[in-house]
Amino acid sequence: MLFSRSGRSIFPLLPPYAAHAPNPNQGHIITLPPDGLTPYLGLRARLSQVWINRWTILLLLVLVRVLLAASGLQADMSTAKREALSACTSVESMGSSMASMPHYLSQGVNELTASGVEKAVSGLKSMLMLTITGVEELVLFIIKVLYQTYLCLFTLAVRGSVHVAVGVIEEAADFLNSTVKEVGDDIGKAVSTFESAFNKFLDGVNTVASAFGASVPTLDLNSSISALENLQLPSSIDKGLDKLNSSLPTFDEVNNFTQTVLRTPFEEVKKLVNESLGTYTFDRSLLPVPAKEQLTFCEGNNGIDSFFDSVTDLVMTARKIFIAVLIVAATLACVPMAWQEIRRWRSMKERSQLVRKEAHDPMDVVYIVSRPYTAAAGIKAASRFSNSRRQILVRWAVAYATTPAALFVLCLGVAGLLSCLCQYLLLQAVEKTVPELSTQVGAFADKVVDSLQNASAEWANDANGVIGHMNQDLNENVFGWVNTSTTALNDTLNTFVDKTTGVLNDTFGGTLLYEPLMDVFECLIGLKVQGIQKGLTWVHDHAHIDFPLLPNDTFSRGAAASISSNSSNPSDSFLADAGDQTSNKITEVVIRVVNKVEDGVRTETIISAVIILIWVFIALVGIVRALSLFWVRDRNRGEGGGARVNRHESDAGGFIDVPLTAIPNTNTDARSMPTPAPAPAPRYEASTSTVVASRAVPVSSTHHEDEKLGFAGERQYGSALKVDGAADLRGSSYVEYDMEKR
């Protein structure tokens, strides 16, 4: 197309390369100037600047950042070392105070122990007095109930039996007396008749016997009959029962004896308890007071120094490694960059030939030559599409995301992430050494706990000896009397049983009631007394006191528990302050430095990620813009689209229309070229037509509006070198109309 009017260049004029051409109207560019010198850099000049390529510079910047981080970490570790040594001194002082804590706590604990013993003994005294009195009255009540119950049963049984026996005997005696007299009279009459008859018989016998000088005595039964007639039971047959009835025991003697015997040991025990425990006071001077302790584990201990020295050596080693690796990487980066520069130079030389071909957009040619790799990436991505419009959009999106500014943002973000990675590796190496310091500090804590344990065990052993002696004294002076009283009470019960048995033996011994009465006594009283004796025997066997002994870890249990592995909260350790993340102040200093560096690395990582996201956003903007035009139909001339350029027509200023597709032409006359059919989309192909001579075309009023619609133009170098009929330097393809850049 033709511009509406000629313009003036806004850039300095270029060298007149085309002035040496055989045909200045051809527009072909001479490859080299006549003297062989070029204003642009050659291959050797380009290779001389390989060492300042972007990757080497970025790696060197990463190295500088890592060295700064290592120096900062080393300075922080030096500060942490001073703070750790100060904290170690504080821990040493605190450990000495804790190790001396038994000295201060023992006085209060001793007072607490003594007061507890005194209160316990006072309560024991009151309990003993109440128990002794209660047992005394209970035993007396039970015994009184037993023997009075037995007395009632005994009286009921004996008196009832005696009354029944006496009545039966009296009735039997009266019956026998009356019956025996009648029987005696009847027997006397019969015997008198028999005696008369028998005497008559004897008289006859005597008559015969007198002849021989002998005589037979006569039978005389009168005296026996008289005795039989006067026979009767004696009146003293029930005197024994009457005597038994009137002589039943009342056990008053047993009661008085029992009361006296049973109360004696109880009263004696109460008297001894009052005398011994009236105002019991524990001797506090017997309880020990441990001496103060002075711990020293910072002086002469190089654990902390060796830890920080190892950290410093680690940082220095890491610094050397990073210097070596990054410098080698930066140096090695020059090799591929040199090879890339060589390929770029060759590619530029090859693609510079595209300038000679009029079938290409000159701006595209400049882009391909100046940005060979990004242009090649765009062309490769666009090759997946068959539509030329979409190919152009894909290349445009790639070019938008790979501009020098966009790539600078991307490289800056990648370099930042690489720097953060190096710092992270250094930080991880330092964090791995923290357990060594924790082990050293753990040894300090163990020393404090061991000192506390020894002091606590020594104090507990001495205090337990005093408590054991007090237990023995109370068991002998108080519960010894309880044992004595239980033995005496058992003896008293035995005496009561023996005394009662003696009374029953004296009263009913040899009678039919003795066995039943003894069975009733054994059932009613004997078994109960045996139960009481068993209870007294149990009291005798278990009547002793044992005050609890003090554990050996009284003063060290809390400190040992705070540093144990079972503690879930690190700040519970006695070496740490409330809210600390670790179990001691020394490790907390190192952790604080590590957290500080970690926060810095995290911040830098976030910043680098944000920078990369900015590049991603830029790339997305290009992709979204390309996608928005991906399915838009090409507009015709009547719809605001551009007109098809079929001929090369130049104006007086030297501008000609550049076709974007191949225009086959076998004629040399531009005016006689046939108009080709419009293609569906422009393609970047080499034109096979020859360059025709430009001719002046009148400038119409519509040319300026056509130029605004976006027609591409290529300046004809031959005519561009002439200004007012004279040779002139080549001007820029950018023209200015009334101070307006087009």
From Swiss-Prot:
Glycans are attached at residues 177, 222, 245, 256, 274, 454, 483, 490, 505, 552, 566. It is found in: Cell membrane. One of its GO terms (cellular component) is plasma membrane. Keywords: Cell membrane, Conjugation, Glycoprotein, Membrane, Transmembrane, Transmembrane helix. Its main location: membrane. Residues 76-137, 342-395, 625-742 are cytoplasmic. The keyword rRNA-binding does not apply. Residues 1-54, 159-320, 419-603 are extracellular. The chain crosses the membrane at residues 55-75, 138-158, 321-341, 396-418, 604-624. It is a multi-pass membrane protein. GO terms for biological process: plasma membrane fusion involved in cytogamy. It comes from the Eukaryota. Belongs to the PRM1 family. Involved in cell fusion during mating by stabilizing the plasma membrane fusion event. This is Plasma membrane fusion protein prm1. The gene is prm1.
